[in-house]
């Protein structure tokens, strides 16, 4: 069985930023091009904002299995094969998120090597990396892999992840979607975008970040004192979910 333990520090840092995987849900259009209502956008913003309240991530939450683990573990192999056949010149990046203000992006690959082994790279503090190109790897199951291979690159929903990367990296001129499935007749497929190709998406990402920032700091929407009779703020000294899980296991109260 495929199994991978994700870096807990990286998982925790991600909860404080608007990432590529969440920003697509607050865009004015869906992945299929349909208009998204303002009510739906705000409902999705509330879901994303809830992650900003995360104080702790359990050890169990850091364990991935099946397709999720498979996809992560195959990333460096996919990049190596893409470099070999298409001369992309990419380096694998892992367990790091690049951030600026509220926007965050975790690169799979860039045209420069990863020199800092840290979960958080703050562009305002450390300066922006200057890759000429970036890469996003997708090691899907057979059906989704083949659908992606046959989808025109201008319609690939994964392009939004590249757009977030380019919004943060102003000097990046090219982005590559790398689809890899070692069991498929089409083992590897690469879709390359120029910055101009993603110009509209980059602009929409920047606008979505600005809208989310306004939503996040609107006390009328997020003021919990107005919606509850009582509430308690968590602290670092409070017992977390790992504590209770271990307690239940010792007391043989877990049905395992």
Model-derived regions: residue spans:
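A generic short-segment signal for beta-strand/edge and adjacent turn/coil regions
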Residues: 59-62, 73-80, 158-160
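Nucleic-acid nuclease catalytic cores
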Residues: 86-219, 223-226
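Alpha-helical structural motif
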Residues: 41-45, 74, 78, 162, ...
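Acidic-basic catalytic patches of nuclease active cores, encompassing PD-(D/E)XK
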Residues: 67-90
């Amino acid at each position: 069985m495929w199994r991978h333990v994700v870096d807990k520090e990286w998982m925790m840092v991600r909860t404080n930023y608007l990432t590529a995987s969440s920003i697509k849900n607050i865009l004015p259009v869906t992945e299929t091009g349909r208009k998204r209502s303002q009510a739906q956008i705000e409902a999705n913003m509330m879901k994303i904002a809830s992650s900003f309240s995360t104080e702790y991530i359990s050890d169990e939450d850091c364990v991935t299995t099946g397709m999720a683990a498979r996809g992560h573990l195959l990333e460096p192999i996919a990049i190596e094969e893409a470099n070999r056949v298409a001369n992309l010149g990419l380096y694998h990046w892992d367990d790091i998120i690049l951030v600026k203000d509220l926007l965050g992006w975790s690169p799979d690959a860039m045209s420069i090597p990863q020199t800092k082994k840290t979960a958080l790279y703050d562009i305002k503090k450390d300066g922006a990396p200057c890759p000429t190109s970036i890469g996003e790897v997708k090691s899907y199951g057979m059906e989704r892999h083949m659908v992606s291979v046959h989808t025109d690159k201008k319609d690939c929903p994964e392009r939004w992840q590249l757009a977030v990367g380019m919004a943060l990296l102003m000097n990046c001129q090219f982005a590559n979607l790398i689809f890899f499935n070692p069991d498929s007749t089409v083992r590897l497929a690469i879709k390359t975008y120029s910055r101009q190709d993603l110009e509209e998406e980059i602009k929409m990402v920047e606008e979505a970040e600005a809208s989310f920032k306004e939503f996040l700091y609107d006390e009328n929407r997020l003021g919990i004192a107005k919606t509850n009779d009582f509430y308690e703020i968590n602290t670092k000294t409070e017992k977390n979910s790992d504590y209770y899980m271990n307690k239940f296991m010792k007391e043989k109260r877990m049905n395992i």
